[in-house]
């Protein structure tokens, strides 16, 4: 691996594109390896990712996955838990052959204006007069597609799950003038 090179997981989405553009702006001379996954029988974002990589002068590496689950046992043995985003196993494996640094836009949707459908729903559920706790509840309702069915009965027994504790964690983010 080369310490002068940086790898980035590139999905062609807003988040990874923004990270790549900022990386190129701040490190104009560094060699960047952009890594994308092409899944068999799925929507293919790699042509768009290739254009983005070219625009920001990054070498684009496409991993073709015919059998997404072929390395599942190995990935679980490393992480010690089942992991939803199994593609990371393949991205990290490829990145390790090229550099010691891997960047991604993972988790940036809320920071970089992704998931606009959630913002529209949040605004439809709240008003300028909504209390902070009402805003927290509306925010969680916007994420209902991420919930596990019967999560209260499942998690309550395993980890003392409590909606009140979730609300108290999120409350500071909605008890301000920026949350509407």
What are these regions (language model features)?
Residues 1-180:
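ATP-dependent adenylate-handling active sites, centered on carboxylate activation for C-N bond formation
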């Amino acid at each position: 691996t080369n310490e002068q090179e940086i790898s980035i997981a590139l999905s062609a989405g807003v988040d990874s594109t923004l990270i790549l553009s900022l990386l190129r702006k701040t490190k104009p001379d560094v060699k960047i390896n952009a890594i994308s996954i092409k899944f068999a029988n799925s929507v293919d974002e790699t042509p768009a990712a290739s254009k983005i990589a070219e625009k920001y002068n990054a070498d684009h590496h496409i991993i073709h996955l015919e059998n997404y689950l072929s390395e599942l046992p190995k990935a679980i043995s490393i992480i010690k838990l089942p992991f939803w985003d199994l593609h990371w196993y393949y991205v990290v494996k490829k990145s390790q052959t090229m550099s010691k640094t891997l960047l991604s836009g993972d988790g940036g949707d809320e920071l970089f204006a992704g998931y606009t459908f959630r913002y529209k729903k949040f605004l439809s559920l709240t008003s300028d007069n909504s209390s902070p706790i009402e805003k927290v509840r509306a925010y969680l309702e916007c994420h209902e597609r991420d919930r596990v069915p019967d999560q209260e009965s499942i998690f309550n027994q395993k980890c003392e799950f409590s909606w009140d504790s979730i609300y108290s964690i999120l409350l500071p983010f909605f008890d301000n003038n920026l949350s509407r």
